[in-house]
Amino acid sequence: MTDTTERLPRALPPGTSPPERIEIDEFVLRRYAPDDDEQLHEAIAESYAEIHQWMPWCVDPVKIEDRRDFIERAALDWATGAAFNYGIFAADLRQIGAVSLMDRIGPGGLEIGYWLRTDATGHGVMTRAVTRLTELGLGLPGITRIEIHCDEANLRSAAVPERLGYRLDRVEDDQAQAPGDSGRTMCWITP
């Protein structure tokens, strides 16, 4: 999928952001802190085989320096309103995934992106996290739609918006960026 961050106007007014911490049942979505680098690294390293198939940023070797760089960029993105990146943490404080609310699809819309640690899949964690971020996103000023973009071959990722009642708005030809990509991006949109 082409990054349109620089070409499209922001959807959110300056200074607008969702909460930094969101509690959901037995887990919490929390804005990244600088000392989350080791947990983030561990979650990605342990789930590399699955995440690498769909996320072009997940490369071998998995390096902690890349996680530190991401957390620094995430802090800047939060401050500018470009993206709101959350770690998903279980009750035992272990990171089990990540979810982001991104202001990169133009006026009126935000995009949600996500990944989940392999051993945390199949328990409804991502469905509940995306449900809550969808509700929060639609409650922000000027936001009328939320989109989820994923490769057509990534059936597990596509199952989340489908379960939540998003509708498949379009499928776009795109350049494959990760090993599992088909080169076709599904764009799901809130009804």
For each of these PLM feature ranges, what is it?
Residues 1-39, 43-50, 85-191:
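Acyl-donor (CoA/ACP) binding surface of acyl/acetyltransferases
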Residues 76-81:
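Short loop/turn motifs at secondary-structure junctions and domain boundaries
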Residues 52-72:
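Conserved GNAT-fold acetyl-CoA-binding loop/helix
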